[in-house]
UniProtKB/Swiss-Prot annotation:
Residue ranges that the UniProt entry lists as topological domain Cytoplasmic: 563-567
Annotated glycosylation sites: N80, N171, N245
Organism ancestry: Eukaryota, Metazoa, Chordata, Craniata, Vertebrata
Gene: LCTL
InterPro entries for the chain: Glyco_hydro_1, Glyco_hydro_1_AS, Glyco_hydro_1_N_CS, Glycoside_hydrolase_SF
Protein's organism: Homo sapiens
Protein name per its UniProtKB record: Lactase-like protein
């Protein structure tokens, strides 16, 4: 083990005991607040095109960077899985609409596949009419069920040809191609879609796609690639917003925003100024990286200071963080009609008191250490702990930091245990109860929260984790070619929250929990019978036709023998 890693490990071991001692939960954090959400509050669930649709090469769709990434070799995705079929959502629209109605949601957040609409990524070259028809039919089906579509333009599945020709988001020309794609979507669907999201979690898209290489396109341009990609994504967002504002807003009366994911960063020791600064730095490098240019016109000052200083220490003449011109700052500032927030968990943050020897990177630029409390409930994914109070703090931070914007929670949820096939997900119920209640407290604090999207409708392809992490309200049996869906206990619980528009009283809320667990036992029996049903299906589809063919053959032989005897 290298000396620097020994020092890191010892430092973290010394910090862990401080977590419980330095911070004690306030009565306000521990208490449950019974009450309802404002009238008109919108409840929903979400998904994304690449994770659920399948049909990766059907009806004129072009390849995406994720198609190529998952097809190009072993070790990139757990189990070497692909999303070629995924949930088969392309062919199961009506079935999934029934699930949405069963949940009683007000809205459904989904993404459009850029390469399904524009196979080469460039509008001037080719528009896929079948792609237009597919999404148009989906939108109509939602509206006919009184479900509002909230549409994401880009959720990570960039057309592969744009990556090959131009280097993807490393090239500023992507901003114009994205604007053209956005205009196509506004033109085709804007008469019915009134809530648009330009990008979903662009921070992860930039960091994992252009720094760590864990996501498509798999580039490892450490310390530079992610900042350049983010710079161009922010410009692309602004161009799409201005196009809508100039050309479409007066006709369509819709809203355009962006969805940014961020965990809450809590200082290990609130009496230590260094920890307070580190926690603030964590939030600015996470949320402020994209939100600050959109709401204030430029990157957070702490990002410019830290990356600039480290770039100089590394012998570079210019900062690795790109610079916006004065004209660009003015153009980008104010380009959001609402702030979309995604949030899953919390980290304790402390300053890093030792030098990093790993070279330039996003992680090293921040000069901080992330920790978790060993007492926090550990959920399915290794990174995901249930810490509801962090949600309220993030919502209040965003509210004050960015000038009281309308906020839509666009992602919040918990993953299933690894390869778990149980439908009694009571731990997810506890997660939902805690996090939604903290959101209610944030509204009580004064946060202008308009809606909540739980992640996600279905179990689906989870990027480099394949199908191992299950976030869905509905369990999907991926080993069955029909991809059947089964409701988990959390379906019943979330539905009750939606119908009641919150948590009316202790007795009623407790009854929801008991009812949810009762129904899941029946659903588990259905799921347990699935192997037998699959076997029966195999018998029906393979054995029976084979036997029939043999019967026909034997009959023909007997008939020939009979004819020979008669002759």
């Amino acid at each position: 083990m290298k000396p620097v890693w020994v020092a890191t490990l010892l430092w973290m071991l010394l910090l862990v005991p401080r977590l419980g001692a330095a911070r004690k939960g306030s009565p306000e954090e521990a208490s449950f607040y019974y009450g309802t959400f404002p009238l008109g509050f919108s409840w929903g669930v979400g998904s994304s095109a690449y994770q659920t649709e399948g049909a990766w090469d059907q009806d004129g769709k072009g390849p995406s960077i994720w198609d190529v990434f998952t097809h190009s070799g072993k070790g990139k995705v757990l189990g070497n899985e692909t999303a070629d079929v995924a949930c088969d959502g392309y062919y199961k629209v009506q079935e999934d609409i029934i699930l949405l109605r069963e949940l009683h949601v007000n809205h459904y957040r989904f993404s459009l596949s850029w390469p399904r609409l524009l196979p080469t990524g460039i509008r001037a070259e080719q528009v896929n009419k079948k792609g237009i028809e597919f999404y148009s039919d989906l939108i109509d089906a939602l509206l006919s069920s009184n479900i509002t579509p909230i549409v994401t333009l880009h959720h990570w599945d960039l057309p592969q040809l744009l990556q090959v020709k131009y280097g993807g988001w490393q090239n500023v020309s992507m901003a114009n191609y994205f604007r053209d794609y956005a205009n196509l979507c506004f033109e085709a669907f804007g008469d019915r879609v009134k809530h648009w999201i330009t990008f979903s979690d662009p921070r992860a898209m930039a960091e994992k796609g252009y720094e760590t290489g864990h996501h498509a396109p798999g580039l490892k341009l450490r310390g530079t690639g992610l900042y350049k990609a983010a710079h161009h994504i922010i410009k692309a967002h602004a161009k799409a917003w201005h196009s809508y504002n100039t050309t479409w807003r007066s006709k369509q009366q819709g809203l355009v925003g962006i969805s940014l994911n961020c965990d809450w960063g809590e200082p290990v020791d609130i009496s230590n100024p260094k920890d307070l600064e580190a926690a603030e730095r964590y939030l600015q490098f996470c949320l402020g990286w994209f939100a600050n240019p959109i709401y204030a016109g430029d990157y957070p000052q702490v990002m410019k200071d830290y990356i600039g200083r480290k770039s100089a220490e590394q012998g570079l003449e210019m900062s690795r963080l790109p610079v916006f011109s004065l004209q660009e700052k003015s153009y980008i500032k104010g380009t959001s009609d609402f702030l979309g927030l995604g949030h899953f968990t919390t980290r304790y943050i402390t300053e890093r008191n030792y030098p990093s020897r790993q070279g330039p990177s996003y992680q090293n630029d921040r000069d901080l250490i992330e920790l978790v409390d060993p007492n926090w409930p550990d959920l399915g994914s290794k990174w995901l702990y249930s810490v509801p109070w962090g949600f309220r703090r993030l919502l209040n931070f965003a509210q004050t930091q960015y000038g009281d914007p309308p906020i839509y929670v666009m992602e919040n949820g918990a993953s299933q245990k690894f390869h778990c096939t149980q439908l009694c997900d009571e731990w997810r119920i506890q997660y939902l109860k805690g996090y939604i209640n903290e959101m209610l407290k944030a509204i009580k604090d004064g946060a202008n929260i308009k809606g909540y999207t739980s992640w996600s409708l279905l179990d689906k392809f989870e990027w480099e984790k394949g199908y191992s992490d299950r976030y869905g309200f509905y369990y999907v049996e991926f080993n069955d070619r029909n991809k059947p869906r089964y409701p988990k206990a959390s379906v019943q619980y979330y539905k009750k929250i939606i119908i009641a528009n919150g948590f009316p009283n202790p007795r009623e809320v407790e009854s929801w929990y008991l009812k949810a667990l009762e129904t899941c036992s029946i659903n588990n029996q259905m799921l347990a019978a699935e192997p037998l049903l699959s076997h029966m299906q195999m018998v029906t589809e393979i054995v029976v036709p084979t036997v029939c063919s043999l019967c026909v053959l034997i009959t023909a032989v007997l008939l020939m023998l009979l004819l020979r005897r008669q002759s």
